[in-house]
Regions:
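Hot-dog-fold acyl-thioester-processing enzymes
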Residues: 1-70, 74
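Hydrophobic alpha-helical context, especially transmembrane and signal-peptide helices
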Residues: 38, 46, 51, 80, ...
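Short, intrinsically disordered/low-complexity patches at protein termini
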Residues: 33-35, 76-77, 82-83, 99, ...
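Mid-chain, well-packed structural core segment of small domains
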Residues: 66-94
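A generic structural signal for short beta-strands and their flanking turns/coil linkers
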Residues: 13, 21, 74-78, 92, ...
């Protein structure tokens, strides 16, 4: 794969997160924290307007943009922080930008935003080039 500093990739990784997506992720991950599937708990105990997606679901969706772009073998490291909750109905767009290349490894800044342009995931990946 040929990459150069400044190369970018942007993709909508999910249109309208559904409660079904969140519930399926809970089953796949084994994370049944009620904040993610029970409005009564999310609102009453958590003080949130509704349930919200697992951070790792958002990370996984963002990671799909990276592997679609770079290929699953090239991706060597990937880490993020969750900057805002992802709510049912949100549409997520992930963007990667090559910020450096050294010794055959590209460093890629990653940001995923919701439909309002608010960052929900920020991080960095490294890929073999």
């Amino acid at each position: 794969m040929t990459l150069k500093v400044g190369d970018t990739r942007e993709a909508v990784v999910i249109e309208k997160v559904a409660r079904t997506h969140i519930t399926k992720y809970a089953g796949a991950s084994g994370d049944f924290n009620p904040l993610h599937h029970d409005d009564t708990i999310a609102q009453g105990l958590g003080g949130y307007p509704s349930v919200f997606a697992h951070g790792m679901l958002s990370m996984g969706l963002t990671g799909r943009m990276l592997t679609d772009w770079l290929g699953p073998v090239a991706l060597k490291r990937y880490g993020v922080r969750f900057t805002k909750q992802v709510w049912p109905g949100d549409t997520l767009t992930a963007k990667g930008e090559v910020t450096a290349i050294s010794d055959g490894v590209a460093t890629i800044k990653v940001v995923t935003t919701n439909q309002n342009g608010e960052s929900v995931v920020e991080g960095e990946a490294q890929a073999a080039v």
